Amino acid sequence: MTILDGQRVIAIEEHYYDDQVTKHFQGLDGKLGGFIKDKIVDVGEGRIASMDECGIDVQVLSHGAPSTQKLDAESGPAVATAANDHLYQICQANPDRLAGFAALATANPKAAVDELERAVTKLGMKGAMIHGLTGGELFIDDQQFWPIFERAEALDVPIYLHPGIPHQKVIDVYLKDYIKQYPGFLNAGWGFTMETATASIRLVLSGVFEKYPNLKIILGHLGETLPFLMWRIDLALNRPGNDGVAFRDIFTSHFYITTSGFFSDPALMLCIQEMGVDRILFAIDYPFVPNEPGPKWMETVMLNAEDKAKILHRNSERLLRM
């Protein structure tokens, strides 16, 4: 590799589609990923060749949104189990190059807890990824989902909160006027950020981190705007009339953020200033974002070799035990 004299490069938010999951996608969810259809289903030679060409040693794979979050409590667990078994087979075909985050059918929290245990202890998954609202309705801070966080803490694995499209009422009021002309406005252009930033703030306010003090959460896209807004959020939540919460302390102690789909020098520098370089991990968001610009950006970004190494592989090696 050319980056940092051949040091390891691990990209941890890299997506694929399993047709046994995507066949359940409906409506707006069914339109996600259409422009990269061939690449997102390629989990073999083409993907590895692209990694080789761009200097990426390892991808941590996760199913693309909305994954299993839209599935019901009855059918969802079997779909998630089959998807994780399939992902295990994908990773075993290239065990030095591919790892995985488990899919969980959160509509059935007990089954999700059991599947997280199985996926980590039997299949070697590095944690789990949860995509947006369960059933299009429920944020992940709802207490029925807390057993998932309890088990993640016990297993010492992170939960990656990935965006999903917002609640339909939010779409109707805030977004629908422009999503026909600009479908990206619904997802990565704003809707995704709105949804996941809200979910993350709610998680802090819920008290889940007091209950599970070693719980670890990952956010993509340089923290979904929250590092930029952290000072103001912390101020607002501690003004007279609020119960008060140590938002900044909780966020910087429990959350990790990745560079997925966000290769901006100023944004990265702000995140380092707010969170410290030890909580930032490299990711690309392949294939929604091409592989090529990510490593090239890291070669030129104004960081010393030690900090680049932390972002590119050391932080992921520590957090995901790679």
Residue ranges and their predicted role:
Residues 6, 15-41, 71, 167-194, ...:
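Active-site gating loops and adjacent loop-to-helix segments of metal-dependent hydrolytic enzymes
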Residues 17-20, 67-69, 107-111, 136, ...:
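Active-site environment of divalent metal-dependent phosphoester hydrolases
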Residues 42-46, 143, 147, 200-203, ...:
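Short, conserved clusters of charged catalytic residues that mark active-site
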Residues 123-126, 153-158, 212-214, 251-256, ...:
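Glycine-enriched alpha-helix->loop->beta-strand junction motifs that scaffold or abut catalytic
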Residues 204-250:
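Aromatic-lined glycan-binding groove of carbohydrate-active enzymes
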